[in-house]
Swiss-Prot record:
It comes from Nitratidesulfovibrio vulgaris (strain ATCC 29579 / DSM 644 / CCUG 34227 / NCIMB 8303 / VKM B-1760 / Hildenborough). CDD domains: MraZ_C, MraZ_N. The lineage of its organism: Bacteria, Pseudomonadati, Thermodesulfobacteriota, Desulfovibrionia, Desulfovibrionales. Keywords: Cytoplasm, DNA-binding, Repeat, Transcription, Transcription regulation. Its main location: cytoplasm. PROSITE patterns: SPOVT_ABRB. It comes from the Bacteria. GO terms for molecular function: DNA-binding transcription factor activity; transcription cis-regulatory region binding. This is Transcriptional regulator MraZ. It holds the Pfam family MraZ. One of its GO terms (biological process) is negative regulation of DNA-templated transcription initiation. It is found in: Cytoplasm, Nucleoid.
Length: 149
């Protein structure tokens, strides 16, 4: 099972976020008790099922002589990672540091990205989807992926 689709949600005043039922089901199928990791990257908060996160972290930590930029990336992504389990109501708590990094306000969008999901501020996400993606479809075609409708 992969994370797909979008879900519009609201953060409560304590930073709690109700996960969509489909996302909760995926977490429960991929990790004991629905354990997950939240971290920040690319202007949003990123959620991984715990086993997928451990695999990513292990691969990253095996890099030999990482560049300064890679070490800084590790500080942001791994240093900012927070393990958690959803509460009985299916909520996770997004930390103040993640909310600040991603500019999250009350209205957010959860976006499935296959093995992970992203949490975007609604207005930032609206700007992303309003872009013209013609150049991306050309790039996909050059990579052998036909994405024409």
């Amino acid at each position: 099972m992969l994370f797909r689709g979008r879900s519009h949600r609201s953060l409560d005043p304590k930073g709690r976020l109700m996960l969509p039922p489909e996302f909760r089901d995926i977490l429960l199928s991929r990790s004991e008790e629905g354990k997950l990791v939240l971290t920040s990257f690319d202007g949003c908060v990123v959620g991984y099922p715990y086993p997928d996160w451990v695999e990513f972290e292990d691969k990253f930590n095996r890099l030999k002589n990482p560049s300064r930029k890679m070490r800084d990336f590790r500080r942001l992504v791994i240093g900012g990672a927070e393990e958690m389990t959803a509460d009985p109501q299916g909520r996770v708590r997004v930390s103040r540091s993640h909310m600040d990094y991603a500019g999250l306000t009350k209205d957010v969008v959860l976006v499935g990205q296959g093995s992970r999901f992203e949490i975007w501020d609604q207005s930032k996400f609206d700007a992303i989807v309003a872009q013209d993606f013609d150049d991306v479809t050309e790039e996909l075609a050059e990579s052998g992926i036909d994405f024409c409708f």
